[in-house]
């Protein structure tokens, strides 16, 4: 037998020593350290917040390891073929679906999701524990289905962003379909825009031929569909119809979306009328007849305007018309320029004749040019006033001469209201004019209306509150502050509150519910012409004028137009420098500030400006060569 071990008894001193060690706890140590701070003024006690950037990933890694080991798992999620052990707290923290279930019954041990695919659920659970997932177009369907059902919004957004990044001609319609199924508005809108912008390439893909009638119909209705010409849209529609004879029943409904009025008469005869379906189907034939009548009745086109006569895929751009360029003072310009948002100023076309101080207006998609002067004679401008009136069609790059004004006019104003044009005042060789005449497109005639109370020229007008408001100008032998309004419904004039500053050769433009008057000149203290820099704004509702930000550069006989809620003031004459100007000044009413935009190609006075809806650059370049060489028949 082994000898017994001898027990060593501890004396009282040793016991007391052990007690001292135990009492030296973390709290005691803390108190001891805090005591060192008391009475010390040299130590900084400013607190700082620190973040352990690895804490979150480490926590997720730990939770994921616990799930793999089924350690402390307290919930089972089941599908028809597979079950998963998870932690309630993890699933409830990222899924509104689980949060609501467990909040309602915290004792829940199992949740069965028989409508969710095991692959989708497994991916969702992995995401909940790691914040990571692997996506492909082959698996995203089951994943996004589970994410939407379980209301995991961050995962839904990741799937939506993935779809947007993956959009291509081959899969764009699949993206539209899946986005529509799960209400992914951003992904759907992005995919639809991709299809609109790449419609020609998309029409050559296999997906295009699989479109339902509703899907292709929605595309052909779209105003923003990018095409080289509407004839191509017709040929693409026929291609879809011809693919399956069962689709013939949709021919009239589908082709009603083609803007036949924007196809030239020659192309209608050569490439549309030759398609048997367009002659055999009564409804399709009517579409063709309506388009031909539209072309045969140019003076009635305003009243015949419809969705099928409007261009698609275009944009609204600034247009300049005529004027007197500074580098060739003795020569007037026939040029019409447009400002491309990407490429700057380019020549669009030429007017039938040179002019400046003419007036322009846009109505029903057409550009109208009226009056002005056909010769450069600074000493007697009124002598060369003309009554010419013509219309430009941007769809076909064509001009037609319209009925001349009843009186020759220069330094007048031209306004559009309710489908009619109103020419106000001005002057000619007989002097200043008080007359007002109205152009009626359906009759191609000008009708006299109630005249101004007093003759005036060099004024500016714009339409606001349903009336043509005429501001300032030259009355008698003086600049005027007078403001009056013409009511077309009453054929009557009414005086309005006057401008604060007299001015002439200025501009007026309507932005929102207000009228803005800018630029022009007046007489200085020594009788000399001086620039008017103040800009005034009129509220028809309050019948009150107020000042807004002044012009950076004073100009007279400039052009003005509104675009995207801003006013653009182009070119003109500066009295201070005695120079023609090429500057473009932009006014933002929301910020009440002027900025200098780009410049005109050449300093110009007597230039007119407007905003016109133009076909996209592709269509402008290829309208004459956009006809497909592949015949279609159905």
UniProtKB/Swiss-Prot annotation:
Stretches of the chain forming a coiled coil according to its record: none
Residue numbers carrying N,N,N-trimethylalanine: 2
Domain BTB: 73-137
InterPro entries for the chain: BACK, BTB-kelch_protein, BTB/POZ_dom, BTB_POZ_KLHL31, Kelch-typ_b-propeller, Kelch_1, SKP1/BTB/POZ_sf
Maturation and modification: N-terminus is methylated by METTL11A/NTM1.
Kelch repeat placement: 317-365, 366-419, 420-466, 468-513, 515-565, 566-614
Designated name of the protein: Kelch-like protein 31
Gene behind this protein: Klhl31
